[in-house]
UniProtKB/Swiss-Prot annotation:
It is a multi-pass membrane protein. The chain crosses the membrane at residues 14-34, 41-61, 75-95, 104-124, 141-161, 194-214, 226-246, 261-281, 285-305, 308-328. It is found in: Membrane. This is WAT1-related protein At3g45870. Belongs to the drug/metabolite transporter (DMT) superfamily. Plant drug/metabolite exporter (P-DME) (TC 2.A.7.4) family. Keywords: Membrane, Repeat, Transmembrane, Transmembrane helix. GO terms for cellular component: membrane. Residues 23-153, 216-333 form the EamA domain. It holds the Pfam family EamA. The keyword Transmembrane helix applies. GO terms for molecular function: transmembrane transporter activity. Disulfide bonds: none annotated.
Length: 385
């Protein structure tokens, strides 16, 4: 039995590593598609339609017996889940990616659990005790993570790996960056494209955090996880299709080249349908704290893949800010894990406490069937006669 549980846990760990690698590949592939010139709204529409066509039938078959009936409260919750987690999350991410690069886009993503904790604290679904080490670790980790995000916005630094700023002026990525190589110039000369991209990425993380904060209480009342995802994609796709209908005037925007078609298929099948399925399955086995610990792998995977396939430079600011974000994330997730572990231990105390022992062992003749001990803990001496 233990070996089976251990095998399932190892499979979940491998699955989470795959999820982060798939997300890193998504950042690189979509950056290539955006450089070609695909419309962001059109890209999101095709991606969501593909994901919805996969998730809807799977949710109908898999959650057929566990899916509760729909009501107005659930529909309203799915509406906001689609608005934040699908529509706002995806669109802001693509706009931010178009103005920055895959390394920065992936480096900000690990802040999602921290933003989720802040929103959950405001909503009352998360508790905070500053007199305990876990509570102090949560606050300290949040501050460190925010400081890392601010550092990435205000400081770029030297190109430690890859081409320098002068050497990369001919590439598509540099067309979206400041020629001075520093972000502070954008605050004096107006908001630059790179600064706008970073703000969109922060908005992307905020939308995803709101999605997770709203989803947590919904899943308690609507335990069909895959159906929740499918309904969220339904409303998000409706938002995306409606926006694309009014904001894209030329029919040529809906035509895809070969590379764009490959990016759309990858985004819909791998980055959406498969990743959401693996996240849900791994969350049931490992729990949310351990699953969140794998998010810091995303910047490393994206930086490595973008350096190989795009030749994107890796700057000092991204390394320092990314390290701060990862450190803050680990602090928050460690504190959450310790709190849940302590709560689980407190739940076992009434069963294993000494006060309960006399009720079990006082009369060994009336002990329950299937007790762990086959003999009485206090054996009577046998007569020598």
């Amino acid at each position: 039995m233990e070996s089976t549980v251990e095998r399932e846990a190892w499979k979940a760990h491998v699955a989470m590593i795959g999820v982060q690698l798939f997300n890193g590949g998504y950042h690189v592939i979509t950056k290539v598609a955006l450089n070609v010139g695909v419309n962001q709204l059109v890209f999101c529409v095709f991606r969501d339609l593909i994901a919805l066509s996969i998730l809807a039938p799977l949710a109908y078959i898999r959650d057929k017996r566990t899916r509760p009936p729909l009501n107005r409260q659930f529909l309203l919750a799915f509406f906001f889940l689609g608005l934040t987690g699908i529509f706002g999350n995806q669109l802001l991410f693509l706009i931010g990616l178009n103005y920055t690069n895959p390394t920065y886009a992936a480096a900000i993503q690990p802040s999602i659990p921290v933003f989720t904790f802040i929103l959950a604290l405001i909503m009352g679904t998360e508790r905070l005790n500053l007199f305990k080490l876990e509570g102090q670790a949560k606050v300290g980790g949040t501050l460190i993570c925010v400081a890392g995000a601010v550092l990435m916005v205000l400081f770029r630094g030297l190109a430690l790996f890859g081409e320098t700023e002068a050497e990369s002026l001919g590439h598509g990525e540099s067309r979206h960056t400041e020629t001075s190589g520093h972000f502070m110039s954008g605050f004096f000369n107006g908001l630059g494209r790179w600064n706008l991209g970073v703000l969109c990425l922060i908005g992307n993380c905020t939308c995803m955090a709101a999605f997770l904060a709203i989803q947590a209480p919904v899943l308690k009342k609507y335990p069909a996880n895959l159906s929740v995802t499918a309904y969220s994609y339904f409303f998000g796709t409706m938002f995306m299709v409606t926006s694309a209908f009014f904001m894209t005037n030329e029919s040529t925007n809906w035509s895809l080249t070969r590379s764009e078609f490959f990016a759309v298929v990858y985004a819909g099948v791998i980055a959406s349908a498969l990743n959401y399925g693996l996240l849900t399955w791994s969350n049931k086995i490992l729990g949310p704290s351990l699953v969140a610990l794998y998010n810091p792998l995303q910047p490393a995977a994206s930086a490595f893949l973008s350096r190989i396939f795009l030749g994107s430079p890796i700057y000092l600011g991204s390394i320092l800010g990314g390290c701060a974000i990862i450190a803050g994330l680990y602090s928050v997730t460690w504190a959450s894990y310790k709190e849940k572990k302590a709560a689980a231990a407190m739940a076992v105390i009434p069963i294993t406490s000494k006060e309960a022992e006399p009720l079990i062992y006082k009369d060994h003749k009336n002990k329950p069937i299937g007790h762990l001990f086959t003999k009485s803990p206090i054996s009577s001496p046998k007569s020598d006669d």
